[in-house]
Amino acid sequence: MDGLQYFSPERVADMVGEENVNEMLCGYRKSLLEALNKLSSALCCNQVEVIHNISHTMKSSSRFVGADVLASEFQKLEVATDNLTNVTQDTEFSISSINDQSKLLLDEINQY
């Protein structure tokens, strides 16, 4: 599929083989949706450590599928929550940005 903006199936294929791309994207999609739900809950409950850990995990997973913009957003959130004890306005903004970027990525994965 040409014209993909938010992820790179070629990168996934290079790592796991062309025949496994759909399975990997399916797993990533599920993980991302779960992470977004957990981020939302952690934000509401002021669970900074949970936000930090999810960000770290999803940064790596997003890079694996070539979702570099989203990986960068997760990395920013990971760094921003390092040594924080309470959620800040910046944390909320970062999570909002991640939600927006994730929607675009998920739409593209669904169309793939």
Language-model segments: which ranges?
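Two-component system phosphorelay core
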Residues: 1-53, 57-112
